[in-house]
Amino acid sequence: VKNTGLVEVPMGTTLREIVFDIGGGIPGRKKFKAAQMGGPSGGCVPAQHLDLPIDYETVKEVGAIMGSGGLIVMDDSTSMVDIARYFMEFCQDESCGKCVPCRIGTKRMLDILTRITKGQGKKEDIDLLKELAEVTKSASLCGLGQTAANPVLSTIRYYLSEYEELINKKDTQSLPQESQTTQT
């Protein structure tokens, strides 16, 4: 966004108001693609939910969390599979390793996401990611493990075609892009 920084808004403020009115919108000629809400283990919310009022229940319904209150805005040049991998790497690194679902689940999801972003994914990887995500969510002992899969689940939910494109194009290598991702 053009105006980065720390802002506090009342519950019920829409994502559109935060990104465009307060944040000043997306720089250049790029378009809004998604907002990752709630910190590293939050979910990615697509443009179709820009008029989403920000409150605990509504945010949860679309696959995100309030979490730390962090908001990262992504433009249309951002690979959502790369984003899921980036946040999973963080969550896997932060896992204390005490419980098996988080320790193994985050590692396996990271390995699969890495393989997909390198153009080595398989069709069954999407279902495996969903299964690992649900087990990690339901069986982990702490909040990190219970929310670590949110970026994976939300990007599969809203950007499945990006996963399928990378899996179907074996010669494509998705590399982290220099995009307009800004924390607000």
Residue map of PLM features:
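Redox cofactor-anchoring modules in respiratory/redox and cofactor-processing assemblies
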Residues: 1-184
